[in-house]
Amino acid sequence: MLDKLPTEQRNPKTMDIDTKSIKEILEMMNREDFTVPQTVQKEISFIEEAVHRTIHSFKSNGRLIYIGAGTSGRLGVLDASECPPTFGVSSEMVKGLISGGLEAITKAKEGAEDSEAMAKQDLLDIKLTEHDTVIGIAASGRTPYVKGALSYANEIGASTVAISNNKNSEIGKIAEIAIEAETGPEVITGSTRLKAGTAQKLILNMISTASMIGVGKVYENLMVDLKPTNKKLVDRSKRIIMEATQVDYTTAENYLQKANNSVKTAIVMILLNCNVDEAIQHLDRAEGFIRKTK
């Protein structure tokens, strides 16, 4: 039953929050938020498994698919939408699906989460394959939409991961990998957009970032597959080249032009003292990893 879940219980530390000053309310919330990273830390071994599955999908021309309802769905859409500008990947490589469709991102459509069949249809619409990794997200761990998504993904042989905020969750029993960051009672009873949502965001950050590092999208700690699509990003691209190769701004600018605005190619051209075609060949042989071109 929903009312038995830790995330739905009343928090004894905030029973009188409505009598507090604004500063005291903020301090209460901050104290509760401090507990979230520790709950995530306990799940790192399971998060690691999820990253390995995701990297395998990427190397098999598969995708990472986040799916959820409400806040959980929105967080998946958010993380997916940040991957193209950060890592220079196609918007198809990491996708976020939310019950009720894109309209549900800005307007709550709470009833949409109750349909398992809708989740299957949403995955059919994007032509889910066995090469994909599906990550179902639900604070309660029992959302029908997410259960339906994971069940269908299992049927066709995709990798499945469940992220929830309660132990022994229903979605955790369906998925191959269960990440269960038990964040406990919320500051406001049942408002899982708070600690539960924060834990989910941290976990999604870890999965997408570590997976992209695992397929060569990062050199040192630099975003070397960044696409310079506006003035700010053009300037950032030049500075990334400068950091990676220790050249000056003008040299970085020249190489970025020679490399047809590919930061990664420009870096390899400088590091290996080669032309653009040779740099591309080096990167192809190294599967996109700059370190492996040396």
Curated annotation (Swiss-Prot):
The active site is at residues 82, 113. The keyword Lipid metabolism does not apply. Pfam families: GKRP_SIS_N. It is an enzyme of class 4 (lyase). InterPro entries: Etherase_MurQ (IPR005488), Glucokinase_regulatory_CS (IPR005486), MURQ/GCKR (IPR040190), SIS_dom (IPR001347), SIS_dom_sf (IPR046348). Gene3D superfamilies: 1.10.8.1080, Glucose-6-phosphate isomerase like protein, domain 1. One of its GO terms (biological process) is peptidoglycan turnover. Keywords: Carbohydrate metabolism, Lyase. Pathway: Amino-sugar metabolism; N-acetylmuramate degradation. Homodimer. This is N-acetylmuramic acid 6-phosphate etherase. It comes from Oceanobacillus iheyensis (strain DSM 14371 / CIP 107618 / JCM 11309 / KCTC 3954 / HTE831).
